[in-house]
From Swiss-Prot:
This is Homeobox protein Nkx-6.1. It is found in: Nucleus. SMART domains: HOX. The gene is Nkx6-1. It comes from Rattus norvegicus. Residues 102-269 are annotated as: Repressor domain. Residues 48-59, 69-92, 110-136 have a biased composition (Low complexity).
Length: 365
């Protein structure tokens, strides 16, 4: 016959090496096998009765000892064993029995009092009633033990947390941000057709726009948030002007050199090719036309003023040439006196200076 201490070691190892699905079977086996067999007094060594032999064959348990290690009191006389039949002496069991193999729980129970043990009785009716009475409490204790085991492990703690990844959309792959080829593939998927394949008339844009420029990338495109409404110090709305990249302005200027006005489809194609909105292209062309008109008007005014001054200069030069021609002609004594008088009046100052120089020359001589 085995001792009680020799039986406790295999049971502890069985507690640690078992699997979680066998916890319920263990609880059902504990209903028939007392957890602390040393709490009961030693039984006489007389021959067992017929009822005890039947119950011992159905539920083997370790032999009972005389020592009470837990300090537990023996059951009261008013319990299930007080029905007239004395307690039975159960047959010795080995740790390799089928009931021991099936009764291995997942983790050792923290408190032995959580699993109530029923006292064996001699009659089959008392054993069935005790099994039905303790089935609910044993199932609850097994569930509590499984919950404690799950809570003690890190996986059990993390399993209770909500999984937000199922609620939010999956993040984009990191290669989209760190791989230019992946970004190019994404851009091609976003814009499947190039600008030249779009339906419509022959485009009039700058030829560089027809090819796939680097500013076609969505990351370099102007977003509507750039023209968002901000609040000033006084709480008034403050409209910010959108900022365009140098490549976009260069393409817009080249297109404006060819045409000052864009139709709807042309404006849509240009906005699509530059990554801008149609309203941004429309407003840019309006402002550019206004600037061009002012500059053109100033240039025209300057040219007109220059032309007028040139005309006046040419007119004065022609009059002087005519006068010089009349002056250089030799005087005819038989000509009209009026003509001679006009020539003298016109060149009076020059003639006076000549007379003055002649008089000075005579005085010096």
């Amino acid at each position: 016959m085995l001792a009680v201490g020799a039986m406790e070691g295999p049971r502890q190892s069985a507690f640690l090496l078992s699997s979680p699905p066998l916890a319920a079977l263990h609880s059902m086996a504990e209903m028939k096998t007392p957890l602390y067999p040393a709490a009961y007094p030693p039984l006489p060594t007389g021959p067992p009765s017929s009822s005890s032999s039947s119950s011992s064959s159905s539920s083997p348990s370790p032999p009972l000892g005389a020592h009470n290690p837990g300090g537990l009191k023996p059951p009261a006389a008013g319990g299930l064993s007080s029905l007239g039949s004395p307690p039975q002496q159960l047959s010795a069991a080995t740790p390799h029995g089928i009931n021991d193999i099936l009764s291995r729980p997942s983790m050792p129970v923290a408190s032995g009092a959580a699993l109530p043990s029923a006292s064996p009785s001699g009659s089959s009716s008392s054993s069935s009633s005790s099994a039905s009475a303790t089935s609910a409490s044993a199932a609850a204790a097994a569930a509590a033990a499984a919950a404690a085991a799950a809570a003690s492990s890190p996986a059990g703690l993390l399993a209770g947390l909500p999984r937000f990844s199922s609620l939010s959309p999956p993040p984009p792959p990191p290669g989209l941000y760190f791989s230019p080829s992946a970004a190019a593939v994404a851009a091609v998927g976003r814009y499947p057709k190039p600008l030249a394949e779009l339906p419509g008339r022959t485009p009039i844009f700058w030829p560089g726009v027809m090819q796939s420029p680097p500013w076609r990338d969505a990351r370099l495109a102007c977003t509507p948030h750039q023209g968002s409404i901000l609040l000033d110090k006084d709480g008034k709305r403050k409209h910010t002007r959108p900022t365009f990249s140098g490549q976009q302005i260069f393409a817009l200027e080249k297109t404006f050199e060819q045409t000052k006005y864009l139709a709807g489809p042309e404006r849509a194609r240009l906005a699509y090719s530059l990554g801008m909105t149609e309203s941004q292209v429309k407003v840019w062309f309006q402002n550019r036309r206004t600037k061009w008109r002012k500059k053109h008007a100033a240039e025209m005014a300057t040219a007109k003023k220059k032309q007028d001054s040139e005309t006046e200069r040419l007119k004065g030069t022609s009059e002087n040439e005519e006068d010089d021609d009349d002056y250089n002609k030799p005087l005819d004594p038989n000509s009209d006196d009026e003509k001679i008088t006009q020539l003298l009046k016109k060149h009076k100052s020059s003639g006076g200076s000549l007379l003055l120089h002649a008089s000075e020359a005579e005085g010096s001589s």
